[in-house]
């Protein structure tokens, strides 16, 4: 309960809330008691309503937060009167408690409640009232979930109120909540995991115990030691309609959770419940989805509208959730009809939401989300969050129950986190708070502290920018409820992040206990603010308009733009130029626009107030989400900035300082103003606390879930800020993913939400995630971020044991950690967070190490981190101390990562452990913003890895190589972003050790974590093997891999849900493990997966820590730059499975339901044939000419599944394969084109030959053609004979090689030796099939191939397309384009030339008037041979694939029609084709009768495959030469000799046929099936034509 307090607004707000709460007593009489203990947060929410008036008491009455919610926040929907009254009851005591807590004693929740009750009405911002209302609910929820969860929810509620009312208020509330959170951390004894059992559906006015909801609340209550907890839960029930429904159109409005939380196991709260226990129904179309992520995906894909508009604002769902007559948190209408306030879908959502609300209420209870309270906060944040809403929409599935109505930040805090955490979630502070609560055992207190940072929150909140910062804060705030969630939720910009965070929060609050009540978070994600409510409208100036997401980021100014044009225009502004000068970083304008385009950035994330604060907040929130633990969440975006490139990553300057503060101080540092570069200790504390809570609450799962969800959001946000994303993603994602795994196990929905909710978030973070890979920020950013999310779960895991071991201590530690985390978040958000969970000291170390970002430190830290994890149990206690230290050190502002890192390193043993993570994180950050973050660079290996981090999928691929045995799990870990694998790995170890602890979930991951720590520390390798085995066991038990998959893939969420995620224990197990590993990140074996996510960790680093991880990382390293993602459309269960099984954490589900499959380039390479060309096409200088990873998902899946069982080693191997644009496969696709082109050219030069051959075949044509052919053939006859001899070889080669480049022309007889990708043209010139360039000598071709088709040529001339390896050469080359005066000028015209030969050729061709090169077909003359060559291509042009096909079909038809002639050439065997070809060449020289000619082709054809086709061709030619001309390409050519026009057409046809024959023949050789076609084509062509075809094939 105490934890809730932090979230509570001031007493006056609390009072208002209390009255509201009383009104909402629907929560139950117990609610009153719970309010006292766990209703601190709830207090504000209920109090706010009460303060506004008793009127809100009506079930629908929104906690209008009286005057407070005045900003543009609609009144927050109040829970039912019963709930409100209950809340009031709870809140009043809570207010007292809050006061006490504020005094430093007593239940923070009570204090908050008192504050709210007494001050809510007076609070300047309705936010507090809203918060109060939500606080009351939170109280109820807390009761249900225990003080912890309820506290979180309350906080979140209070937070929501603040949020809705105004940024300032929101921040204040957050601060309050933070304060309360701290208290809650210590006070709350209940795990959210336990307490998360109950979830209040927004529409259901009763608690749904998806998690064992009420019983969970009871357990939470017991743990919290306060009956009020139960009350809180009840209240939450009444209020539950609040967030879930409203929060995300997709989540709440878009889907109804049928089966709701109640159907779920306690392990999976609302979100999980939705995914595990209930089917979610799309409110818009009624479609039922398995989990929220699916729903989100569906909503995003089908009901896309605007993320915000579509679902209205989270607050709107909120209102709906308050359902009875919930007003949107609009300031004014306390009793406004929910429908009235709902935007767009809100009304629809209201009713659906009512049902949803019931389910979500349960979720809410689970998530500890006060529905009523959330709406108001949502409103204030809504506009900002609206953008995030989109991603949130998808994510809402996970957090749908509680988060739906809330803004993403709120939802995260509320839905994802625990009541308190949720409250915080809306802002950075609440977010962490939720995590603290999530840490559950000790989390509540921390959350309270975060809220205790109420003033801070307010302070930040008032500022718009700060509001955004709060977004970041929510990142931190999300810590409580899956810090991430809160973190993301905090800031509208971060909504996606919030969504991610939301799940985390939910996971923290409900995930651990009930799979983290994911429902909360997803809503955030989907449209955290989409809930149609005034808040949505008020908060967002265009709440209902679908606006273009701001995907273009100016890293120097942290500004986001909707189009590249706007960005370019911005580059010309003085503001930008000054920023660049002051930053000392290279001007981003010099980079390709693609480097600044982060499509993954969800509209939600980036749109809301992206300007500065919003963007920063969003980034922070997203980062926090990514961190999956408030700490990481907040810093991730800011941390990178803090590191060095802070400016770049942050959405906005506030993001930077505030971002750091947000990230770091989001929870405890909500107060820390997101503006401030350094996160406040509180934030970090909260983050840590949140992490801790998650773990304590079994939130390993919840956190993972919530975080995972948030992470996606974060990713989206991160996308906006690469650094942010990278850091966030790297660690955050790791954590988040791991958490997601846990959470997914509990709440697959949650996971889904994360991925789905924030497709872009997913994608977006990818690039930032790979600091290194800034080159391909958008793609990598997109893909990898998600995986990185996994790391948070490990953190959670570590934390969980600690929590289990010492709830109170853990709480304290969590609190410190939260702050530390937040700070870390700034600098090493993910690492800190991750480490936080493994142990506080770990967090600190990580944070510091991250700051240090020294390779040595990283490796050392990794190893130590492993040890730390070993010592996790011991360290947990230490961790608390360390955490505190860390907080202090982190206070250094992880923003200034280096310093913080050093500080963190203070903890010798833990820091070492953490250090690696931190470093890793730093590296991530550094890599992400390598240009801006020097500190990260200290991890050069990581620097290389960052891209990997970006492409952690690749990492996953890589991972297999070193750890065949572990590879299975390890690889999974790697590939699943170390989500599942990490979780799996750690889980395996931890389960035995930690099963008894806290909760099964927590225990599992704790056990995994501790054992992992111990084992890793003691014997990383053995541990890894053990983990691997255990992971497998766990995988089997928990289907961790599946969970990982789910985590990795939002779509997979359902899978996750069905698999272990569904069950609390399995999720916890895998999640925590992942989390721990993630934090250690790669240092541990599990980390490798994370490393996949968090590429930044250098393989060496990983290796030192865990041999297997290093493997992963090692391979990853080379690949990271090549990492890319493949978009998979459709549900991701299979994909997820592939990921989990395949060990590819590359699949990321985007908010729009797309599943991005990240594939290492090397993986891609093996499948190069699939899209080598596309790779080449896609390659861009910025991507370093690495092959896109868009290679078939199939390949990836194959890799994944193969890799999963140590098959990943092969995958790694594949990865290792260097990308070569000229891969034969690449040629494969172009083969036809090349063949055709080659054939055309061949025809051009060889046409005469063909004509002659045809002419020979066709008497008329034969004579004319023979003359020409004789001339040509006699010249080339020797060559031809050679070719004939060689052609079989060439042909064989063709068969063996997809792109053999035998010469098509007879002259090519020697072409065979040219190169596999070249062909000799009839003219004797050698043509490069890769780029169609021609050369007179082989040496030129060789030189050309070396220069253009091998190795990496990153410098590409935009004018002529030439590529250069070195910048010097490239610069020199560019000079030539610029040079106006070229040395050689034409005396007859103004033209100038660089080379004398060019001038001479020009004069001869243009000015002499001599046209000595004549076209044999049309008799046109050309002054230059190359002109003639080009012209000849026009004759062959019609011979395109299509024409070829038509010609082939015609030939086939003719063949069928004329079967009589089939016997003509039946004698020759298949081998005779080549002979025929040779013969045809001979025939060409010696005019052969049509019959003879036909016989030859027919024989080969017959021998090869289709006698009929042969006969047809033979028949056509033999029977009717003139008919043949039409049917047979060859004959056309011959005819052409006679009739130019007809020849042209025929020639074209012949070319087509020939090309088809070439291809067919090639295929024939490869597959006999194609023999028929080849035969047909060959038949159609006379022997001579066959020769041509043969040559063509050779070319192929």
Curated annotation (Swiss-Prot):
- According to the record, the residues making up region (Disordered) are 1-143, 209-273, 490-530, 578-813, 825-945, 1017-1074, 1252-1322
The domain of life is Eukaryota
Bias type Gly residues, positions: 25-53, 501-518, 656-668
| Effects seen without this gene | Embryonic lethality: embryos are defective in cellular blastoderm formation and fail to activate genes essential for cellularization, sex determination and pattern formation. Cells display nucleosome occupancy at dorsal (dl)-bound regions.
GO CC terms in record = chromatin; nucleoplasm; nucleus
Which Gene3D superfamilies does the annotation name? Answer: Classic Zinc Finger (3.30.160.60)
Region (Transactivation activation domain (TAD)), start-end ranges: 904-1297
Which keywords annotate this record?
Answer: Chromosome, Developmental protein, Metal-binding, Nucleus, Repeat, Transcription, Transcription regulation, Zinc, Zinc-finger
Entry keyword Phosphoprotein: no
Other information: 'Vielfaeltig' means 'versatile' or 'manifold' in German.
Q: What does this protein do?
A: Transcription factor required for zygotic genome activation (ZGA), a critical event in early embryonic development during which the developmental control passes from maternally provided mRNAs to the expression of the zygotic genome after fertilization. Binds to regulatory DNA sequences containing a 5'-CAGGTAG-3' sequence motif, which are highly enriched among developmental enhancers. Within 1 hour into development, or by the embryo's 8th nuclear cycle, binds the majority of its motifs genome-wide.
Name of the protein this chain belongs to: Transcription factor Zelda
Q: Which organism is it from?
A: Drosophila melanogaster (Fruit fly)
Query: What's the gene?
Result: zld
